């Protein structure tokens, strides 16, 4: 059983405060307040049952990019607090040379007002075979990895800024992603 408290205050990164470009819409100089984070987490680890992690995050003065009224991506700062709660359960076990690695996470951001969008449900699952080969000169892992996240407004990317920005027009997710892998 373990607990942790983390408190920080830091300036938004440089792209939020100063950006100069030959594009008229991409020039700004801002005097944003420090972003203040308070994070509390509890973690329970058990080889017999499962691992459990609880996180509570409180963010004040979050800096973010989004499109303005003229559809240009600009920096903004949200002066209220945003609260994020995460609950993660994970379990890894094996049967002979077959391995199962499973994780599920529920998360919710409150008072985010469309500024911090997160999927409510995330799962990551791997099923694979692992064994030594060639007189233990090689360890082989091969199997499938399946990931899923619930539909949400995923951030878009602005290549001029090299930054992600908030968008609230198209939801993404709600379907599984499967990969086959071989590690040697």
Language model: regions and residue ranges:
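Exposed, low-structure sequence patches enriched in small/polar residues
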Residues: 1-184
């Amino acid at each position: 059983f373990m607990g942790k408290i983390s408190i920080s205050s830091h300036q938004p990164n440089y792209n939020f405060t100063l950006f100069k470009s030959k594009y008229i819409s991409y020039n700004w100089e801002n005097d944003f307040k420090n972003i203040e984070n308070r994070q509390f987490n509890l973690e329970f680890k058990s080889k017999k049952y499962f691992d459990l992690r609880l996180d509570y995050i409180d963010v004040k003065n979050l800096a973010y990019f989004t499109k303005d009224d003229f559809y240009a991506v600009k920096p903004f700062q949200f002066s209220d607090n945003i609260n994020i709660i995460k609950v993660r359960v994970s379990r890894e076990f094996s049967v002979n040379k077959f391995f199962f690695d499973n994780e599920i996470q529920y998360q919710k951001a409150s008072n985010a007002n469309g500024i911090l969008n997160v999927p409510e449900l995330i799962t990551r699952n791997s099923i694979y075979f692992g064994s030594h080969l060639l007189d233990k000169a090689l360890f082989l892992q091969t199997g499938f990895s399946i990931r899923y996240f619930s539909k949400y407004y995923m951030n878009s990317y602005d290549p001029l800024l090299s930054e992600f920005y908030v968008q609230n027009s198209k939801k993404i997710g709600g379907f599984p992603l499967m990969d086959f892998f071989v590690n040697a």
